Swiss-Prot record:
Official protein name in the record: SWR1-complex protein 4
Residue ranges occupied by any SANT domain in the UniProt entry: 130-189
Region described as Disordered: 1-32, 285-359
Claim: Nucleus is one of the keywords in the record: yes
Compartments, as annotated in UniProt: Nucleus
Reported function: Component of the SWR1 complex which mediates the ATP-dependent exchange of histone H2A for the H2A variant HZT1 leading to transcriptional regulation of selected genes by chromatin remodeling. Component of the NuA4 histone acetyltransferase complex which is involved in transcriptional activation of selected genes principally by acetylation of nucleosomal histone H4 and H2A. The NuA4 complex is also involved in DNA repair.
């Protein structure tokens, strides 16, 4: 038995400490690859891609296999079918159809369920045609042919015009344009809507507007579009030059208008251009002396009247039209032109502050209103936030304060009259014809019976 075994049996510590394993493992340092200098590898660090790692990552990719669809067996066959739109004239056609195991004999046309009719065509009776729908350019047979054609092609006027081949009973072939067909159909629709009784007049008016059609305007529009489409390069260049010139003229007009507004604003304080200006204000601004004008008018009235001026010849209409001369109509009175201008251009209003348009109280009540607002902690001069809502509320407050001051004045007046009447009733004051006489601050002598009593009447301050 060795000494180490004895120490182990007696649970004694070993004489020398046992060697302990290091907890930190050495991290393997990657070796510098061949062909790269040490300085370049130090700059790259651990960001250098490894071809082996890339190949290993690509090898680890597992592509997903194509899923195996567990569906029913489907195959295509050439089958015969009858078009759903030709029930009256059945035609057997063939097409490739997908046949499933569940329904191998299914030969119904798939697109038959989509064969729906388009917009409905209005119908009329013989009585309605005789009363409201007669047109000298259209016969009854041709109108019926038109409606049948539109019903067959679902109101597609372009297709109907291409298929239009009406032959009159006399053997005459007639060709109608798209505008003729539209004009005839929409005219009949409008007449039927007007003549038939409608439960909702508003809906009836909407329908009439929906069927509105102007044949002349449509023809003119198509002609204009055709002319634009067939323009030559020279005409296109000319139109572009005209457009550039018009744009330049509009820019100059805007610039001239801005300069004119700026001039009017700087000279007279106006915010717009040519407006109707008060003549008296213009005279005051220019500084015309009215006394001089009055004196001049008196001198002219005192002077002898001049000889009557020869009457101008009447204007010749042909001469004026050839030289593009236009004569303004002479107003019957001086105010006719002014009234005409005022209708086109309303009187000018300069920019103003909302606070300046508040109604001012009466001078006699202004002080009392100011005192009343001061008691409420408000200022009668200005608001901190003079917005539109605040100005409206402040205006209402001023009106209420004025009404309150007026009410207080009336109450004081009535109380004073009652006081005077009571004193007259008690015999302290002589009866006067005016019971509303104010009692001043002097002493009054009142006769009561055989004694004379001097009473001092307390003055009452009138509000």
């Amino acid at each position: 038995m060795s000494a180490q075994d004895v120490r182990s049996i007696l649970s004694l510590p070993p004489s020398t400490p046992l060697p302990t394993l290091s907890s930190s493992k050495k991290v393997p340092v990657p070796r510098k690859p061949d062909g790269i200098t040490r300085e370049l590898y130090a700059l790259i660090g651990d960001n250098a891609p490894s071809l082996a790692d890339a190949q290993a990552s690509l090898a680890a990719v597992k592509y997903r296999e194509k899923p195996a669809l567990k569906g029913k067996k489907v195959h295509w066959e050439w089958t015969k079918f009858t078009p759903a739109a030709r029930r009256d004239n059945p035609v057997r056609l063939g097409h490739w159809a997908r046949i499933t195991d569940s329904d191998p004999n299914d030969s119904v046309e798939y697109f038959g369920k989509f064969n729906l009719h388009g917009p409905s065509v209005m119908e009329y009776s013989q009585f309605e045609y005789d009363q409201h729908l007669v047109d000298p350019n259209w016969t009854l047979q041709e109108t019926e042919y038109l409606f049948e054609l539109l019903k067959e092609y679902d109101l597609r006027f372009i297709v109907a015009a291409d298929r239009y081949a009406y032959v009159s009973p006399e053997g005459e072939k007639r060709k109608r344009s798209v505008e003729d067909m539209k004009d005839r159909y929409y005219t009949i629709c409008r007449r039927l809507i007007r003549t038939r009784t409608a439960s909702d007049p508003v809906h009836q008016q909407h329908l009439i507007q929906a069927y509105a059609f102007d044949k002349a305007r449509e023809i003119k529009r198509k002609q204009y579009a055709s002319d634009l489409f067939h323009l030559t390069p020279a005409e296109i260049a000319e139109e572009e030059a005209l457009y550039v010139e018009i744009t330049r003229m509009q820019q100059n007009e805007r610039r001239f208008r801005a300069d004119r507004d700026e001039l009017m604003r700087s000279v007279m304080g106006l915010d717009s251009g040519l407006v109707e200006v008060d003549q008296s204000a213009m005279e005051n601004a220019i500084g015309v002396d009215k006394n001089k004008k009055k004196r001049k008018a008196e001198d002219e009235s005192a002077a002898p009247s001049p000889a009557p001026t020869p009457k101008k010849p009447a204007p010749n209409a042909g001469f004026d039209n050839s030289r593009c001369i236009y004569h303004l109509p002479t107003p019957s009175n001086a105010n006719s032109l002014t009234s005409h201008l005022s209708q086109k251009h309303p009187p000018h209003q300069q920019a103003f502050l909302r606070g300046s348009r508040l109604p001012l109280p009466k001078p006699t009540a202004a002080g009392r209103i100011t005192d009343l607002l001061a008691e409420l902690g408000l200022s009668a001069n200005r608001l901190v936030m003079p917005t539109r809502q605040n100005m409206e509320v402040f205006e209402g407050l001023l009106n209420a304060a004025a009404a309150l001051v007026e009410m207080r004045r009336q109450v004081n007046r009535v109380e004073q009259e009652l006081r005077v009447v009571r004193m007259q009733k008690e015999g302290l004051m002589p009866v006067t014809t005016n019971p509303s006489a104010r009692v001043k601050g002097e002493a009054g002598v009142v006769t009561g019976g055989s004694e004379a009593t001097v009473k001092a009447v307390t003055p009452v301050k009138e509000c």
